[in-house]
């Protein structure tokens, strides 16, 4: 275990978490709290971002491992919110909003995987 990797995760995680918080608050103020649009947006854009990083690491970027860990594990890990997604789904189900819960689950997974694929494809094209 290298301390540089731990510090990279901590620093990136702090930045990603702050970004997630600000985006979530912004969406809540913009669209209201009834549906977890902020979490959906965060998961989709986080998947796009990690796809772009993966694509760049594979073909273009020759970054040190600590930098890769900072970007992917730190920033993307701090930014994406799968655990929050699970809790938001539970709340929708608990309120009896089964159609919203199903749409949210399917939409989150399909759009996030699609965004990851798009991120990799973007890098392959440019």
Swiss-Prot record:
State the activity regulation. Na(+) is not transported, but it plays an essential structural role and its presence is essential for fluoride channel function.
Reaction equations catalysed: fluoride(in) = fluoride(out)
Q: Where in the cell is it found?
A: Cell inner membrane
Cystine pairs: none
Q: How does it sit in the membrane?
A: Multi-pass membrane protein
Gene Ontology terms, MF aspect: fluoride channel activity; metal ion binding
Q: Which domain of life is it from?
A: Bacteria
Q: Might you report a single GO cellular component term?
A: plasma membrane
Membrane spanning residue stretches:
5-25, 39-59, 69-89, 103-123
Task: Give me any GO biological process, just one.
Answer: cellular detoxification of fluoride
What does this chain do? Fluoride-specific ion channel. Important for reducing fluoride concentration in the cell, thus reducing its toxicity.
- What is the recorded name of this protein? Fluoride-specific ion channel FluC
Q: Which organism encodes this protein? A: Nitrobacter winogradskyi (strain ATCC 25391 / DSM 10237 / CIP 104748 / NCIMB 11846 / Nb-255)
Q: What is the lineage of its organism?
A: Bacteria, Pseudomonadati, Pseudomonadota, Alphaproteobacteria, Hyphomicrobiales
């Amino acid at each position: 275990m290298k301390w540089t990797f731990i510090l990279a995760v901590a620093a990136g995680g702090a930045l990603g978490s702050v970004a997630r918080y600000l985006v979530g608050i912004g969406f809540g103020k913009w669209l209201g709290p009834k549906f977890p649009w902020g979490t959906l947006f965060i998961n989709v854009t986080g998947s796009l971002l990690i796809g772009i990083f993966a694509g760049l690491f594979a073909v273009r970027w020759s970054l040190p491992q600590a930098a890769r860990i900072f970007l992917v594990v730190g920033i993307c890990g701090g930014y994406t919110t799968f655990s929050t997604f699970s809790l938001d789904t539970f709340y929708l189900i608990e309120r009896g909003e089964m159609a919203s819960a199903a749409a949210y689950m399917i939409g989150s997974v399909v759009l996030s995987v699609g965004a990851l694929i798009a991120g990799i494809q973007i890098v392959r094209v440019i």
